[in-house]
């Protein structure tokens, strides 16, 4: 990929990018991709496609409930770095 900020164009990635932006906010997503190195950019693509383009697309849980579960899991695991962004996401989802 010659342009570091060019994103894959497949539907799963694009749906994941839209959901990730909806939940986490544009600034969070922009920062995640802007801060990615050549080594970590594939991981950002994977997270966007697998987590946000697959798991977060399922309609068995609404976004508010899914966010609250995520916050609870991250809290229990002591993952404070990830928790900060997901608390903002939960607030974006009405929690």
Question: What kind of feature is each model-predicted range?
Answer:
Residues 71, 76-95:
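Mid-chain, well-packed structural core segment of small domains
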Residues 1-65, 92:
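Acidic, glycine/proline-rich low-complexity segments that act as flexible tails and inter-domain linkers
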